[in-house]
């Protein structure tokens, strides 16, 4: 038996929305350069970009696995794997990101809706504390904007709020859900500052410069 729809469900992206993933990438680059040298660093990011083009999402561990097939006897690669898995993601949460989740919970269910691989992205959600903060309501797809029918099955609602740093994703979801969706564009991270992004995809319903500014927004009209 299907669940009755809630008045509103709040969906949050992870990377550069709740968590500073640009900083994570910088830390990985610095670690590779410092401990493994420029050649390893350059090759890793070359493979990473190739894999992102193939898969449509960032796969840090997948890039390492593919690198390993080219350098099977390089034992340093195993240490890189341990470093990635044990990365302190909680230290990279944006200020007031957990407060923003709690703020929205006053009006409805709060969930994570993210893209990524099946290992590193869930690990990121868990070690950052986001998994617990949303009561395990975590959905991770390859292209989340193509999975909205499944999102509706898991979290049926009369209205949705999507908080994301990518206008492209918000615009694609708006085309599908229309007036049932309120889009919130968080201008954090490199994607949010691409030249001409708002002209290309149109403005979101709400635009904020940082996730903490969500605390000043009242969504009570969505949950009468």
Model-derived regions: residue spans:
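Active-site neighborhood of HAD-like aspartate-dependent phosphohydrolases
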Residues: 1-46, 69-70
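Asp-based, Mg2+/Mn2+-dependent phosphohydrolase catalytic module
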Residues: 1-7, 126-162, 166-224
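Generic enzyme active-site microenvironment
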Residues: 11-13, 113, 162-163
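A metal-dependent, Asp-based hydrolase signature
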Residues: 24, 35-38, 48-85
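Substrate-recognition/cap helix-loop segment adjacent to the acidic, metal-dependent catalytic center
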Residues: 101-111, 115-139
């Amino acid at each position: 038996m299907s669940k009755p729809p809630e008045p509103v469900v709040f969906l949050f992206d992870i990377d550069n929305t709740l968590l500073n993933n640009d900083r994570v990438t910088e830390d990985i680059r610095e670690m590779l350069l410092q401990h493994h040298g420029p050649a390893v660093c350059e090759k890793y990011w070359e493979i990473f970009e190739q894999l992102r083009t193939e898969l449509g999402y960032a796969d840090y561990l997948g890039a390492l696995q593919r690198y390993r097939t080219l350098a099977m006897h390089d034992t340093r690669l195993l240490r890189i794997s341990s470093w990635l898995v044990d990365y302190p993601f909680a230290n990279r949460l944006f200020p007031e990101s957990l407060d923003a989740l709690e703020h929205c919970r006053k009006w409805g269910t709060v969930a994570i809706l993210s893209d990524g691989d099946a290992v590193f992205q869930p690990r990121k959600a868990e070690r950052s504390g986001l998994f617990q903060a949303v009561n395990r309501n975590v959905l991770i797809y390859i292209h989340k904007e193509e999975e909205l029918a499944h999102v509706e099955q898991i979290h049926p609602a009369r209205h949705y709020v999507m908080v994301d740093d990518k206008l492209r994703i918000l615009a694609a979801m708006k085309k599908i859900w229309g007036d049932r969706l309120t889009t919130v564009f968080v201008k954090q991270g490199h994607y949010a500052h691409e030249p001409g992004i708002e002209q290309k995809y149109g403005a979101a319903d709400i635009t904020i410069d940082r996730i903490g500014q969500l605390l000043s927004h009242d969504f009570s009209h969505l949950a009468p």
